[in-house]
Swiss-Prot record:
Name listed for the protein in its UniProt record: Pleckstrin homology domain-containing family A member 3
Tissue: Widely expressed.
InterPro entries named in the record: Boi1/Boi2-like, PH-like_dom_sf, PH_domain
UniProt membrane topology term: Peripheral membrane protein
Region annotation (Interaction with VAPA and VAPB) ranges: 97-300
Keywords: Golgi apparatus, Lipid-binding, Membrane, Phosphoprotein
Residue positions where Phosphoserine is found in the record: S236, S244
Amino acid sequence: MEGVLYKWTNYLTGWQPRWFVLDNGILSYYDSQDDVCKGSKGSIKMAVCEIKVHSADNTRMELIIPGEQHFYMKAVNAAERQRWLVALGSSKACLTDTRTKKEKEISETSESLKTKMSELRLYCDLLMQQVHTIQEFVHHDENHSSPSAENMNEASSLLSATCNTFITTLEECVKIANAKFKPEMFQLHHPDPLVSPVSPSPVQMMKRSVSHPGSCSSERSSHSIKEPVSTLHRLSQRRRRTYSDTDSCSDIPLEDPDRPVHCSKNTLNGDLASATIPEESRLMAKKQSESEDTLPSFSS
């Protein structure tokens, strides 16, 4: 239903005409009929609101959601208000009846499911007792007489009947559960983004290729690893050979111990000393020997 109703806005503008539309239990209003495509200025859900009729004015009515919304509306005449009251009341009643039916169905299925579950527990206890009885018959003490075939047949028939009843009750529980929890509830129309498969980014693909290489890449990598390892092994063998050669020639001294080594201040500072040259060292040794020869003459 749709039509014009006056809505109380504020004390400055007072009652203003608005275009109201009642659809699927929701009452929405617009500035005019032409503004329906632009979107509503407000709405109220009939299932949760209260309809109140003004006691003095036969054209006024109120829609109230306690603590949330309060619509003051006025029709053109009493007949128009009555027409709106019937439409609003019918919409509210239909929604309420639908809700109560669903609640009744849910409560009834819950109670029946509880009853069947209690029956299953009872049959489970009976099964355990009957299985225990048959075990006692089978593992009977040798000192006593063996159980009769009649007792065994009776116990097995009771066990078979209890099993059949248990299975039947279990099937009824499954039917009740399927009626209560419909398949639509288990269909995920909007899958969770954390669970839904997402195409990996290029960076993730690179990481995956590095951390989890395929068979071909593993063969290549193993081959590339073997090559440097073999190269290192060859180098180490060569070094061992050179070390063994140097050890065999270790009788030859690396430095001549008779050669005098003169360390001057310059050599301590990191400069090359001139005394390290063989000719200059010989001259220095010659001068030193001459000075030693002249010392006895002075002493004498």
